[in-house]
């Protein structure tokens, strides 16, 4: 495989996360800030899945990369690309359904399920991104760091967005969640700086 090739999956992944991290974060944060079905539906109303076509853009881009490197089929790099595609497709489909069927997806149990899936999916994306960056090492330190950071960053972004867009007590809880996640992210970066220094 061309040594330049692994750059492109990472580029597509980075652009996808830049564009789609808010929707992942809203799905992740909803059970932590919403207290009832109406508040769950208010969070779901902030989702804009499918409309921006971010998932379609990612699928198109990474599919081109995967098909352009047939020799990679079966190796860790190829598996990482396929893992990202899979969680992106399922996550996008869930958010599209949730946006259109708020009464069904607004239940506490389903929202917790979506939150759990979002957290696990961001871990998969993080480990896959680490694999792309390290040339195939799936369980690398880079992947672990990216995975935790993705969850924190997506949660923080969603909490900030909810705090700005929602004005009732739900908005207050979003502001509190943003403050807590900001402190956690600061501690995370300080911890990483300490480890790197050591």
Identify the function of each model-found stretch.
Residues 101-198:
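Long, contiguous internal "core" modules enriched in hydrophobic/ aromatic residues
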Residues 18-25, 92-97, 149-162:
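Transmembrane alpha-helical segments that form the membrane-embedded catalytic/substrate-channel core
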Residues 50-118, 132:
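Membrane-interface helix-loop-helix modules in multi-pass inner-membrane proteins
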Residues 30-43, 70-77, 96-112, 162-174:
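Membrane-interfacial helix termini and the short, flexible loops that connect transmembrane helices
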Residues 5-17, 76-90, 138-153:
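Alpha-helical transmembrane segments
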Residues 1-53, 59-62:
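N-terminal signal-anchor module of multipass membrane proteins
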Residues 6-7, 59-72, 187-196:
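Membrane-embedded alpha-helical segments in integral membrane proteins
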């Amino acid at each position: 495989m061309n040594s330049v090739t692994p750059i492109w999956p990472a580029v597509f992944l980075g652009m996808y996360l830049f564009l789609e991290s808010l929707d992942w974060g809203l799905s992740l944060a909803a059970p932590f800030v919403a207290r009832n079905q109406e508040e769950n539906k208010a969070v779901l109303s902030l989702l804009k899945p499918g409309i921006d076509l971010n998932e379609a853009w990612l699928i198109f881009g990474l599919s081109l990369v995967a098909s352009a490197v047939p020799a990679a089929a079966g190796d860790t790099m190829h598996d990482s690309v396929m893992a990202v595609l899979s969680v992106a497709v399922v996550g996008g489909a869930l958010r599209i359904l949730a946006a259109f069927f708020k009464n069904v997806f607004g239940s506490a149990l389903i929202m917790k399920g979506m939150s759990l899936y979002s957290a696990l999916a961001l871990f998969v994306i993080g480990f896959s991104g680490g694999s792309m960056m390290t040339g195939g090492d799936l369980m690398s330190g880079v992947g672990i760091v990216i995975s935790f950071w993705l969850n924190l960053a997506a949660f923080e972004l969603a909490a900030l967005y909810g705090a700005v867009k929602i004005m009732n007590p739900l908005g207050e809880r979003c502001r509190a969640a943003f403050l807590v996640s900001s402190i956690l992210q600061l501690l995370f970066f300080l911890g990483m700086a300490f480890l790197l220094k050591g």
